[in-house]
Amino acid sequence: TVSSMVNGGRRVTPHLGVSVLDKKGKTVKTFKYGEKEGIVSEKTSETTQELLEKVVSEGSGKNAYLEGYSIGGKTATSQTLPRSAGKYISSFIGFAPADDPQILGMVIIHDPQGIYYGGTIAAPVLRDIYDNVLPYLGIEKK
């Protein structure tokens, strides 16, 4: 999985929440998710983080750039069948902060109208999501 490739090589069960709070902010329930064995070495994971950060800072994922944050990611554009229909799927998967991933998200746009490249149309959507989510998670700008 992509998350395993950027978090030190550890496989983590995907999850949507870590705790439930009452009206006063007191933790009512905490969810625990186990980590499984490594699927790649820490060195491979570190190299992957660095390369995917460059996709956003220097490459096709520039539209995912968010000032003050380091984001890593990968763009993708694929043509659907039949090819003669001229339809595409545009996507971007990204994680932040790039050097210590805390969140991973993916945007998939089926049959975009006009421009259809993942880095052009999907990457900015994840940037806008992270613009709201990262401060909410307490991840500060550098």
Language-model-derived ranges and their functions:
Residues 2-36, 43, 52-141:
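Active-site beta-strand/loop architecture of penicillin-binding DD-peptidases
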